């Protein structure tokens, strides 16, 4: 007897484009949420867009977060309990969005994502990434009820944040390969739909990397839509698998050993060059990934991540210890093999 079930939670409204920040009130109104909103933001996005958001709501409250941490989630939850909001609005980058996502989950209320940068797919997904000491935790939470992404704001954001978002998406290519490998060798549940959507999104950015340029709303449009697709793929899968494989394990290890050196998206981008080499060999697609990252002005080497060769190799050889997730690195890779991979792909000079 067939007894399989799935529960896919997706945003109800996704609004992307020129000047759509001024349509936030209408987009939220269509959700029929009640009560006052609590706007969760950080200093820079609050200065840039906070007043425009507050002007669209009656009696909004605002909480400004300074860091991403479990303590920040707890503090925001306490603030929200005092304010008694009907819902949260997360305005900014990964920091306020991840914090608001977790706080909303604790409070049992919905939240709306209003990204001002396109640095990673957390703007849409049902996952929060929270650092704790030398470890970064990926925590499940409900995805936003709506996403309102104004390409005017995002095009004006620092270019390195946008290239990090692009690199994060491009790394989906190898994440899906790891997922398929886990299905074949460990019978891990696999979603053809989610896998295909994630892979198609990565391929779209690889093929159009030379058309994505700083300051262009058209480029911001492409990147944000790709981030939305990646987040939707994770929601369909009910897992981060469509966007997180061995390349993310390497990045998490770098977060432990070399915290703050590089952006998350840039780390997984460089890592995906090497994991693709492990999947398909010297004639595989790793060079296409590297060339796409280079076309975006994203890092392609350890040095460009602010790492020396030894730090990169140490992360590559120990990444499999991060979590019990079957990937191409299962069982680990020894130092000699890691040096060969990193050298062959140009990630280190050798």
From Swiss-Prot:
Sites where the protein binds Zn(2+): 168, 248, 264
Keyword Zinc tagged: yes
The species this protein was found in: Halorubrum lacusprofundi (strain ATCC 49239 / DSM 5036 / JCM 8891 / ACAM 34)
Binding site for NAD(+): 94-98, 116-119, 125
GO molecular function: glycerol-1-phosphate dehydrogenase (NAD+) activity; glycerol-1-phosphate dehydrogenase (NADP+) activity; metal ion binding
Catalysed reaction equations from the record: sn-glycerol 1-phosphate + NAD(+) = dihydroxyacetone phosphate + NADH + H(+); sn-glycerol 1-phosphate + NADP(+) = dihydroxyacetone phosphate + NADPH + H(+)
Pathway: Membrane lipid metabolism; glycerophospholipid metabolism
Family: Belongs to the glycerol-1-phosphate dehydrogenase family.
Main subcellular location: cytoplasm
Gene designation: egsA
Keywords: Cytoplasm, Lipid biosynthesis, Lipid metabolism, Metal-binding, NAD, NADP, Oxidoreductase, Phospholipid biosynthesis, Phospholipid metabolism, Zinc
Enzyme's top EC category: oxidoreductase
Entry's cofactor comment: Binds 1 zinc ion per subunit.
Protein name: Glycerol-1-phosphate dehydrogenase [NAD(P)+]
């Amino acid at each position: 007897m067939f007894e399989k079930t799935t529960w896919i939670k997706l945003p109800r409204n996704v609004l992307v484009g020129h000047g759509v920040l001024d349509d936030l009130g209408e987009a939220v109104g269509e959700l029929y949420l009640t009560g006052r909103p609590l706007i969760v933001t950080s200093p820079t996005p609050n200065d840039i867009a906070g007043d425009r958001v507050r002007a669209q709501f009656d009696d909004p409250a605002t909480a400004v977060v300074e860091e991403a941490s479990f303590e920040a989630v707890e503090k925001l939850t306490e603030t929200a309990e005092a304010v008694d909001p009907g819902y949260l609005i997360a305005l900014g980058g990964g920091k306020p969005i991840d914090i608001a996502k977790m706080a909303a989950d604790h409070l049992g209320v919905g939240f709306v994502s209003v990204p001002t940068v396109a640095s990673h797919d957390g703007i849409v997904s049902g996952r929060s990434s929270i650092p704790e000491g030398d470890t970064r935790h990926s925590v499940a939470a409900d995805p936003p009820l709506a996403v309102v992404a104004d390409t005017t704001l995002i095009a004006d954001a620092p270019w390195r944040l946008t290239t990090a978002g692009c690199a994060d998406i491009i790394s989906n290519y190898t994440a899906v390969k790891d997922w398929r490998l886990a299905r074949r060798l460990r019978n891990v549940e696999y979603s053809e739909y989610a896998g295909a959507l994630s892979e198609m999104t990565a391929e779209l950015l690889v093929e159009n990397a030379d058309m994505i340029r700083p300051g262009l709303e058209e480029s911001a449009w492409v990147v944000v839509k790709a981030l939305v697709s990646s987040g939707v793929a994770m929601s369909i899968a009910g897992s981060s698998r469509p966007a997180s494989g061995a390349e993310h394990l390497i990045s998490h290890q770098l977060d432990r050993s070399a915290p703050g050196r590089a952006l998350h998206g840039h780390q997984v981008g460089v890592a995906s060059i090497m994991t693709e080499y492990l999947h398909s060999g010297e004639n595989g697609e790793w060079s296409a990934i590297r060339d796409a990252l280079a076309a975006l002005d994203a890092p392609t080497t350890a040095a460009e991540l602010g790492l020396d060769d030894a730090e990169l190799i140490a992360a590559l050889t120990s990444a499999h210890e991060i979590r019990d997730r079957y990937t191409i690195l299962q069982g680990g890779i020894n130092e000699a093999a890691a040096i060969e991979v990193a050298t062959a792909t140009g990630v280190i000079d050798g």
